[in-house]
Amino acid sequence: VGRVSGSLSLVEFPADDPARARRFWEGVLGVELDARTASEGQGWQTHAAGPAIGVHERGRGPGDSYSLPYFVVGDIGDALMRVRDLGGTVVHPGEQWAICKDSEGSPFGLARAPLAE
């Protein structure tokens, strides 16, 4: 069953020490963070039902200075246009996922529905 548009798909944590961060989140949540597929990007994440928790090495991606919630969208191009039209900014556009800021400057990510499943 696919996730509906607008649902939370991923919370991403940049880490100075990815191995330590993986141990932390695996221990806290009691789940494994697996290596991502090429389409998911660099790092590790949970692949269980519900929103994923992800970790990547700081300095290896556009969302490196803060934790990011990612939300599912059906069409990422349309979603990025809506972000701009509503006063937000697109920090890192993409076809699979994107990083944006809302009208108040808070960062968030968007993930195309198949990527988020």
Model-derived features: where do they sit?
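N-terminal beta-strand motif that seeds the catalytic metal site of vicinal oxygen chelate
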Residues: 1-23, 50, 66-71, 112-117
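Vicinal oxygen chelate
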Residues: 8-16, 58-86, 96-101, 106
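Amphipathic alpha-helical segments
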Residues: 17-32, 83
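Ligand-binding pocket scaffold of soluble enzyme catalytic domains
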Residues: 21, 34, 77, 89-90, ...
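Short secondary-structure junctions
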Residues: 30-37, 86-93
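Conserved short beta-strand elements that form part of the metal-binding/catalytic scaffold
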Residues: 31-66, 107-114
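Residue-level signal for tight coil/turn positions that link beta-strands
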Residues: 50, 94-95
